[in-house]
Amino acid sequence: MATDKKLKCVVVTPERAVLDETADMVILPMIDGELGVQPGRAALVGRLGKGELRLNSGSQVRKWRLEGGFAQVRSDVVTVLTTKVTG
């Protein structure tokens, strides 16, 4: 079943908000492996490891490198708090 629901992804560092976009799927580099988040996912708070944050929208994939931090998923919003983002 196709869905038009999207996730909102917000990435924040101590200096500024780096990203505020929508995506079909967000892949997070958690401390114990990757976590794929799709619309409708149950709420969670987790610790991020160093790795690649990916936003999938249709056939487009955008990537950023994170240096750890924390992620919250709630009501189709993925919030990432990290010290450093590159990409």
Question: Where on the chain are the PLM-derived regions?
Answer:
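Compact, glycine-rich, soluble single-domain proteins
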Residues: 8-87
